[in-house]
């Protein structure tokens, strides 16, 4: 069954969890698609994961177009979500539309952009012109130099700001709201408040769905493992088994567990 925006909203309304994994090539796209992962995120995480750079900032539009095309060739049913790259959408809604249109022409079905309520005008501009949007709030990696590192967002008084971001962006027409590294109670409140389905990474188990970087889920990560990561390969013994275990754990609401949550 072809996954669409309507499919995602129906799953969320029925309380059935949505699964998302990053994907950068045709072979893994085919494997994840056949396993039943609903969303393949062609993320700018390809910078650190595939290119070996230390952040997502150097990733270019050309990089994204190449990897989206690769994934689109391998996926038959999954919805392909493409990241908008740093510097290619922040200047104006018009700049964002030109960038997003190229991502869709390459094979994406939806684009993801980072930022809070101030991105509402751009979100609305894209949606009104036929481009589905996933809003990325909380820890937004393209803002790493502003945050001074990769840190949990939304604690204390900052929680109200992130809740407002989610409300404003959903009202602007975002089809999905992705929350990264926010406290689980805040993510739960946002999920219960906004109409758009929510996807969490380091945001507790009460979101509409979950996402992990594929390589993290398979135990392929240099250095220290992030708190929200679980290595599904350890027990599964095969890539296909690990993917199936991830899907089952998300659907059964056993992942993320307490130890993966802020």
From Swiss-Prot:
Its EC number is 2.1.2.11. 3-methyl-2-oxobutanoate binds at residues 44-45, 83, 112. The keyword ATP-binding does not apply. It catalyses: 3-methyl-2-oxobutanoate + (6R)-5,10-methylene-5,6,7,8-tetrahydrofolate + H2O = 2-dehydropantoate + (6S)-5,6,7,8-tetrahydrofolate. Its cofactor is Mg(2+). Binds 1 Mg(2+) ion per subunit. GO terms for cellular component: cytoplasm. Keywords: Cytoplasm, Magnesium, Metal-binding, Pantothenate biosynthesis, Transferase. It is found in: Cytoplasm. GO terms for molecular function: 3-methyl-2-oxobutanoate hydroxymethyltransferase activity; magnesium ion binding. Its main location: cytoplasm. The active site is at 180 (proton acceptor). One of its GO terms (biological process) is pantothenate biosynthetic process. Mg(2+) binds at residues 44, 83, 114. Pathway: Cofactor biosynthesis; (R)-pantothenate biosynthesis; (R)-pantoate from 3-methyl-2-oxobutanoate: step 1/2. Homodecamer; pentamer of dimers. Catalyzes the reversible reaction in which hydroxymethyl group from 5,10-methylenetetrahydrofolate is transferred onto alpha-ketoisovalerate to form ketopantoate. Belongs to the PanB family. This is 3-methyl-2-oxobutanoate hydroxymethyltransferase. The gene is panB.
């Amino acid at each position: 069954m072809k996954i669409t925006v309507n499919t995602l909203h129906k799953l969320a309304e029925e309380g059935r969890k949505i699964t998302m994994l990053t994907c950068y090539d045709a072979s893994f796209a085919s494997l994840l698609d056949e396993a039943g992962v609903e969303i393949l995120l062609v993320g700018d995480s390809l910078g650190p994961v595939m290119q070996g750079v230390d952040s997502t900032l150097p990733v270019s539009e050309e990089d994204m177009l190449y990897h989206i095309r690769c994934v689109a060739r391998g996926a038959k049913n999954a919805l392909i979500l493409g990241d908008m790259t740093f510097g290619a959408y922040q200047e104006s809604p018009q700049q964002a539309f030109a960038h997003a249109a190229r991502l869709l022409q390459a094979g994406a079905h939806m684009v993801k952009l980072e930022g809070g309520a101030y991105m509402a005008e751009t979100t609305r501009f894209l949606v009104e012109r036929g481009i589905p949007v996933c809003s990325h709030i909380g820890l937004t990696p393209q803002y790493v130099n502003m945050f001074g590192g990769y840190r949990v967002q939304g604690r204390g008084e900052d929680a109200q700001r992130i809740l407002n971001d989610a409300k404003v962006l959903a009202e602007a027409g975002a089809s999905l709201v992705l929350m990264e590294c926010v406290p689980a109670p805040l993510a739960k409140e946002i999920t219960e408040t906004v109409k758009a389905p929510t996807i969490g990474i380091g945001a507790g188990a009460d979101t509409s769905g979950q996402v992990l970087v594929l390589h993290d889920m398979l135990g392929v990560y240099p250095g220290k493992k992030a708190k929200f990561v679980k290595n599904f390969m350890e027990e599964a013994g095969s890539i296909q088994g690990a993917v199936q275990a991830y899907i089952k754990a998300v659907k059964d609401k056993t992942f993320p567990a307490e130890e993966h949550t802020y």
